[in-house]
Amino acid sequence: MKKATQSKAWTTVQIARHPERPQFLDYVGEIFTEFDALHGDRLFGDDGAMVGGLARFDGQPVMVIGQHRGRSTREKLKHNFGMCNPEGYRKSQRLLDMAERFNLPVFTFIDTMGAYPGVGAEERGQAEAIATSLAQLSSLKVPVIATVLGEGGSGGALGIGVADRVIMLSHSIYSVISPEGCASILWKTAEKAAQASEALGLTADKLQSLGIVEYVVDEGEGAHLDPERVMQNLKVVLKQALDELLPMDANERCEARYQRLMKFGSENLGMAS
């Protein structure tokens, strides 16, 4: 039984990384209309890994922000393989400010191995940029809905992952570290990545059982096999989540978001909330 569970977790990792898996801009084109991308952080530059802008969702103006990886070599380089630099997170902060100013609900979409670990990124304040994003999202007065599309890797994912509702596709993953990285630390070899994937509890079902994720969107054997159906399934869940949040008072919504974060781990660790 244990081996079967490990195999299932590792299979999920492989599907989440499938090269034909739909990416952020694919979902934007199917779920939203009138998308108008905005560029730059007004401090250093524009980060192709973080894409965001104004759009309409069922006719309603919204702000859409997400990580895009790219498929061709040229596109992957343009989008830095979905690994954001500090200017990417600062661009998202600028868009979040705009969303709050104009009372626009925010949809974020996560698909990254992690934040870019380069020297330049560290020199420009990668940790500060992510921390500021976490603080900003925690207190934003408008509804925030986050969706994990593929890989949700560590702080790179959390930088746009604090939300009122979190959604995962059924073959997406969300983890503090990659299975290979975990295996290299614990067992000094990446060959035990399958075992690490089970230990990390990175699957959508597991995270939903822990209360970290509210919704899991069924994608059958993988979103790459029937992308249009999966996108429509996700659109239905996004609408449901937004309909739950819009009637709430802004202060009530912020307090509920705070309490959602504070309860993580309390039940499983036997701690008081």
Curated annotation (Swiss-Prot):
InterPro entries tied to this protein: Acetyl_CoA_COase_a_su (IPR001095), ClpP/crotonase-like_dom_sf (IPR029045), COA_CT_C (IPR011763)
EC annotation from Swiss-Prot or TrEMBL: 2.1.3.15
Reaction(s) catalysed by this chain's protein: N(6)-carboxybiotinyl-L-lysyl-[protein] + acetyl-CoA = N(6)-biotinyl-L-lysyl-[protein] + malonyl-CoA
Compartments reported by the entry: Cytoplasm
Keywords, alphabetical: ATP-binding, Cytoplasm, Fatty acid biosynthesis, Fatty acid metabolism, Lipid biosynthesis, Lipid metabolism, Nucleotide-binding, Transferase
Gene Ontology biological-process annotations: fatty acid biosynthetic process; malonyl-CoA biosynthetic process
CoA carboxyltransferase C-terminal domain span: 1-244
Molecular function (Gene Ontology), one example: carboxyl- or carbamoyltransferase activity
Top-level taxon of the source organism: Bacteria
Pfam families: ACCA
SUPFAM superfamilies according to UniProt: ClpP/crotonase (SSF52096)
Gene Ontology cellular component terms for the protein in this record: acetyl-CoA carboxylase complex
Pathway: Lipid metabolism; malonyl-CoA biosynthesis; malonyl-CoA from acetyl-CoA: step 1/1
Its biological purpose: Component of the acetyl coenzyme A carboxylase (ACC) complex. First, biotin carboxylase catalyzes the carboxylation of biotin on its carrier protein (BCCP) and then the CO(2) group is transferred by the carboxyltransferase to acetyl-CoA to form malonyl-CoA.
Quaternary structure and partners: Acetyl-CoA carboxylase is a heterohexamer composed of biotin carboxyl carrier protein (AccB), biotin carboxylase (AccC) and two subunits each of ACCase subunit alpha (AccA) and ACCase subunit beta (AccD).
Family per record: Belongs to the AccA family.
Name of protein: Acetyl-coenzyme A carboxylase carboxyl transferase subunit alpha
Organism: Acinetobacter baumannii (strain ATCC 17978 / DSM 105126 / CIP 53.77 / LMG 1025 / NCDC KC755 / 5377)
